[in-house]
A protein has these predicted regions:
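Conserved N-terminal subdomain of the carbohydrate kinase-like
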Residues: 1-76, 247-256
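Beta-strand->loop->alpha-helix junctions that form or flank phosphate-binding loops
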Residues: 2-7, 26-36, 105-107, 165-169, ...
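A generic structural signal for well-ordered alpha-helical segments
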Residues: 18, 95-96, 157
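Conserved beta-alpha-beta core of the PfkB/ribokinase-like small-molecule kinase fold
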Residues: 74-151, 172-174
Length: 256
């Protein structure tokens, strides 16, 4: 895990929580005088969430974090748009030179989205609203229209990035576009209590599945299962499922 934290109680708690889960936190830099990024999350009775974010130290990630990302060999590099676009672009270039596969999650969509796609991420992951924003199209109705989401994904896959594009559709699953074509990956039926962290679970599971060597459709299927399982548990980090949780919630067995 690479990024910036504030030199505060929240940063200490975040570092300790990640370390307790077995994450290597050597790449987390505490910035003196900075505050850690925070999110205020509300969840409605149906389990849907809304989030207000104060980026804090996330906005200070730069060359040191890019260097830390490549301090050890890796199979897949996951990049979040919650850090400055300049750092993301530098990491994409270095990953390409090192032949490391990249998964770019453009959430939220930055003003530099087009420039980042021009850096050629291997995978782009966005939700329906984000996909429409990146494509310069109206977002109205996209989450409920898989055919339109598929068309947007296909158009993005033919753009500067030229890699695999995934548009997540919540409970409906996801759309995959890229070589050799497009596919709709259905969601898993679960009883959702809290959708916080579902997108994070999706992206993390996708990266792990890709590192295990499965094909794109299988990787997105695993990601859909993990995202669905995350909605059956409350909380953000504490709600992220393990393979046994995914199996219990969805019946999906993690790729061997």
């Amino acid at each position: 895990m690479v990024g910036c934290l504030g030199d505060d109680e929240f940063g200490a708690r975040l570092r300790a929580g990640l370390a307790a889960e077995g994450a290597d936190v050597a790449g987390l830099r505490a910035i003196p005088g900075a505050v850690s990024g925070l999110a205020l999350i509300t969840v409605d009775p149906a389990g849907e969430n809304s989030i207000a974010v104060a980026p804090g130290a996330n906005g200070l990630a730069g060359a040191a974090e890019v260097a830390a990302a490549f301090a050890e060999p890796c199979d897949v590099l996951v990049l979040s748009a919650e850090v400055p676009a300049a750092a993301l672009a530098a990491a994409l270039r270095q990953a390409r030179a090192a032949r490391v596969r990249t998964v770019l999650n453009l959430a939220p969509v930055p003003g530099e989205a087009a420039a980042l796609l021009a850096e050629g991420p291997d995978w782009l992951v966005v939700n329906a609203q984000e996909a429409a924003a990146v494509a310069g199209q109206p977002a109205d109705g996209v989450p409920d229209d898989p055919a339109r989401a598929q068309a947007i994904a296909a158009s993005l896959a033919k753009g500067p990035a030229g890699g695999q594009v995934v548009v997540t559709l919540g409970a409906a699953g996801a759309v995959l576009a890229g070589p050799p074509g497009t596919a709709v990956v259905p969601g898993f039926v679960v009883t959702a209590v809290d959708t916080v962290g579902a997108g994070d679970a999706f992206v993390g599971a996708l990266a792990v599945a890709l590192a295990s060597g499965v094909d794109p459709v299988a990787a997105v299927t695993a990601a859909c299962a993990a995202g669905a399982a995350a909605t059956t548990r409350r909380g953000a980090q504490e709600g992220l499922p393990r393979p046994a949780d995914v199996l219990a919630a969805t019946g999906f067995s993690w790729p061997a």
